[in-house]
């Protein structure tokens, strides 16, 4: 007998022990991400062919203390490699791990290779060749701290490669993991099995192969143990022949029914082709279907639903996934009473959207991603009970009630004002710390970063509730909900690009048409707290020369132009936003040489600007480090210097509309008086109803000549 290590994923060790025991292995011992045991050649051949859970089997030749490269070389060269494989065989070293002295796995592999070839040379034999592309032998090394395991891989390519799925295909779930999910889902091998989001069909194919008692390795063409010196071809031929016969007979004896649905017809074709290659196509019925509308199938009494729904990690996918899981849970309860369900996901928050209590749960890894598998018993309920439960279940009641109240009040005001864009919630309740804005038929939820004393899991669960409640209260479709995370920004980082969706939306603000982008940037191109300021600028602009500094996307310029400004000058450092401003102007028919756009650092532009203007709007950042200037800008510290330059451009009888977002900003009225200017605080007049709870969102001033 030889010592072996069966390699598997974290969380599958005990399941693998059970499987190996059924295959005739005694005293199998679980270790981290593996199982150790002893076996004869016949037993290991059978394990390689029949294991659904192991990713590979390694014959352990040595376990040793490895402090440095010399320990590694000496331990390797002390093994009698001639007894393992012939010098004509090509080999490769798979080296996993590092320690304080062996810091590079390639270097570790080289030292092992040296030890092997030197062993052959010392016995007067030719050096075996290295081949990374098509090796006959794979030497396996696992190093952790000062402990090393060295052996030969019995398999070759991973055992998850059953041969029915092309490696080029999309495979979010490895076959070994799919088998573990099936083994733990509560299915007895005879009940009908349904995967309503089957994708490429891996879960159903693995289950069908189990029901048919089909060896998972029956389609494999090459095994590394066939190149070992102690290979027993007759024993292997007999084991393989038995498995082939069993595969043919087993398919005909299956009494379970398998159903796979997916809303993507292209993916379904892939699933059908995979099932054909696996030899179980006649057992599985694939059809196009949506998980949100799936109904109980004929003959599905006491069936099992198993699924691996999407659980995307990228910011912005959450609203759609929350709606998907919510709809899935609703359909399970409405249509599949008396059945069982087993759902696999990396997100406990998404699983909570099913609104079902799990009977059992298991922890497994999908690659490096920690995941949960939860098993549910679905209670039998009448249609009226299901409908009543759905109607009466309110998510996050305090938040939902506040949102309803705000929508009633603010929505009515927005319709009267002819506004497409407005805020319906602004962290009204401290525990639900988000801002929610309406943009036409879409909604943007901005999550303010949670305080450090709030546990991450609690913050995630609360955000999930917010999104679900917002969808429920507003009735908006999930694909029209956009999620952003807002943290304290420095300089112009709020303008940095987040993505590349490039999907824009045209909105209306007091009769002015504007373009917003809800996806690609932290901000959307329109600061909603300044809507009344912009309207006022439009009312003041008739027949005047208008200057807009720190113009962003030029929305204030558009209001001024639509209001009848004689000319407009729009200045911003970003060429992206200047082009956006041009598009906004063109959308409203405001084109011509009287409308100028200048890309420049506004502070430096002011130092050298010439000309006079009747109306100037300036909304500078609270603080800025300009690359083109030697010093920083602080609006509290530097606003008098700013006004000094602005006065030079302000025509007699003209007005500066000066705004900023610094809380508790204090205007230096004495400094203004010395310049011959005076200021009137109009902040309360420019605060719209939807921002009435946040009276310090901005401050706004009218600055004019004192005389």
UniProtKB/Swiss-Prot annotation:
UniProt KW Transcription keyword: no
Keywords for the protein's UniProt record, in alphabetical order: Cytoplasm, Methyltransferase, RNA-binding, rRNA processing, S-adenosyl-L-methionine, Transferase
Localization (cell): Cytoplasm
Pfam family membership, one: THUMP
Catalytic reactions of this protein: guanosine(2445) in 23S rRNA + S-adenosyl-L-methionine = N(2)-methylguanosine(2445) in 23S rRNA + S-adenosyl-L-homocysteine + H(+); guanosine(2069) in 23S rRNA + S-adenosyl-L-methionine = N(2)-methylguanosine(2069) in 23S rRNA + S-adenosyl-L-homocysteine + H(+)
Cited InterPro entries: 23SrRNA_methyltr_KL, DNA_methylase_N6_adenine_CS, RlmKL-like_Mtase, RlmKL-like_Mtase_CS, RlmL_1st, SAM-dep_methyl-trfase, SAM-dependent_MTases_sf, THUMP_dom
GO CC annotations, alphabetized: cytoplasm
EC number from the UniProt entry: 2.1.1.173, 2.1.1.264
Keyword Cytoplasm among record annotations: yes
Recorded coiled-coil stretches: none
Domain THUMP: 43-154
MF terms (GO), sorted A to Z: 23S rRNA (guanine(2445)-N(2))-methyltransferase activity; RNA binding; rRNA (guanine-N7-)-methyltransferase activity
Principal location class: cytoplasm
Family according to the record: Belongs to the methyltransferase superfamily. RlmKL family.
Entry function: Specifically methylates the guanine in position 2445 (m2G2445) and the guanine in position 2069 (m7G2069) of 23S rRNA.
Name this protein carries in UniProt: Ribosomal RNA large subunit methyltransferase K/L
Species name: Vibrio parahaemolyticus serotype O3:K6 (strain RIMD 2210633)
Upper classification of the organism: Bacteria, Pseudomonadati, Pseudomonadota, Gammaproteobacteria, Vibrionales
């Amino acid at each position: 007998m030889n010592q072996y290590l069966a390699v598997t994923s974290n969380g599958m060790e005990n399941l693998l022990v059970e499987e190996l025991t059924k295959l005739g292995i005694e005293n199998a011992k679980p270790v981290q991400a593996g199982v150790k045991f002893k076996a004869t050649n016949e037993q290991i051949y059978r394990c390689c062919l029949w294991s659904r859970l192991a990713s590979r089997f390694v014959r352990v030749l040595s376990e040793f203390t490895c402090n440095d490269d010399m320990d590694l070389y000496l331990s390797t060269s002390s093994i009698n490699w001639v007894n393992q494989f012939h010098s004509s065989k090509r080999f490769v070293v798979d080296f996993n791990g590092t320690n304080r002295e062996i810091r590079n796995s390639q270097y570790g592999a080289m030292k092992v290779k040296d030890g092997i070839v030197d062993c052959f040379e010392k016995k007067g034999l030719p050096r075996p060749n290295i081949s990374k592309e098509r090796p006959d032998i794979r030497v396996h090394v696992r190093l952790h701290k000062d402990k090393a395991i060295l052996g030969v891989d019995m398999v070759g390519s991973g055992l998850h490669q059953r041969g029915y799925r092309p490696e080029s295909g999309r495979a979010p779930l490895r076959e070994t993991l799919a088998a573990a999910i099936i083994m733990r889902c509560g299915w007895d091998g005879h009940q009908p099995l349904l995967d309503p989001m089957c994708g490429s069909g891996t879960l159903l194919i693995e289950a069908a192969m189990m029901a048919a008692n089909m060896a998972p390795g029956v389609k494999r063409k090459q095994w590394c143990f066939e190149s070992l010196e102690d290979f027993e071809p007759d024993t292997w031929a007999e084991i393989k022949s038995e498995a082939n016969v069993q595969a043919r007979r087993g398919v005909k004896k299956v009494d379970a029914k398998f159903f796979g649905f997916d809303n993507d017809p292209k993916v379904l074709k892939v699933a059908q082709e995979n099932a054909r290659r696996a030899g179980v196509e006649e057992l599985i019925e694939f059809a196009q279907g949506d998980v949100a509308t799936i109904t109980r199938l004929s003959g599905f009494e006491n069936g099992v639903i198993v699924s691996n729904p999407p659980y995307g990690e990228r910011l912005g996918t959450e609203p759609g996934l929350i709606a998907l899981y919510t709809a899935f849970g609703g359909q399970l309860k409405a249509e599949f009473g008396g059945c069982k369900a087993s759902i696999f996901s990396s997100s406990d928050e998404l699983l909570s959207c099913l609104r079902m209590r799990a009977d059992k749960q298991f922890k497994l890894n999908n690659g490096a991603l920690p995941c949960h598998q939860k098993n549910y018993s679905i209670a039998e309920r009448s249609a009226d009970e299901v409908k009543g439960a759905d109607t009466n279940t309110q998510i996050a009641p305090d938040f939902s009630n506040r949102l309803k109240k705000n929508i009633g009040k603010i929505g009515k005001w927005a319709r009267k004002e002819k506004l497409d864009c407005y805020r319906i919630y602004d962290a009204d309740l401290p525990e639900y710390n988000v801002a929610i804005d309406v943009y036409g038929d879409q909604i943007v939820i901005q999550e303010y970063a949670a305080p450090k004393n709030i546990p991450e899991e609690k913050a995630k669960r609360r955000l999930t509730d917010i999104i679900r409640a917002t969808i429920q209260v507003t009735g908006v479709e999930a694909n029209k909900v956009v999620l952003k995370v807002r943290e304290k920004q420095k300089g112009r980082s709020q303008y940095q690009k987040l993505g590349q969706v490039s999907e824009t939306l045209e909105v209306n603000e007091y009769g002015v048409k504007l373009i917003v982008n809800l996806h690609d940037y932290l901000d959307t191109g329109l600061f909603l707290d300044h809507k009344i300021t912009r309207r006022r600028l439009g009312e003041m602009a008739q027949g005047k020369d208008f200057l807009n500094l720190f113009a962003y996307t030029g929305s204030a310029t558009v209001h001024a132009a639509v209001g009848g400004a004689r000319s407009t000058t729009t200045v911003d450092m970003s060429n992206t936003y200047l082009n956006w401003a041009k598009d906004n102007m063109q959308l409203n028919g405001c084109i011509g040489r009287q409308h100028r756009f200048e890309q420049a650092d506004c502070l430096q532009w002011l130092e050298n600007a010439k000309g006079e203007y009747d109306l100037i709007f300036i909304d500078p950042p609270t603080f800025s480090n300009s690359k083109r200037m030697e010093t920083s800008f602080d609006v509290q510290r530097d606003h008098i210097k700013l006004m000094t330059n602005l006065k030079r451009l302000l025509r007699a009888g003209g007005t500066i509309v000066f705004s900023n977002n610094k809380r508790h900003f204090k205007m230096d009225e004495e400094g203004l008086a010395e310049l011959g200017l005076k200021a009137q605080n109009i902040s309360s007049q420019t605060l719209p109803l939807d921002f009435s709870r946040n009276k310090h969102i901005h401050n706004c001033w009218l600055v004019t000549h004192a005389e």
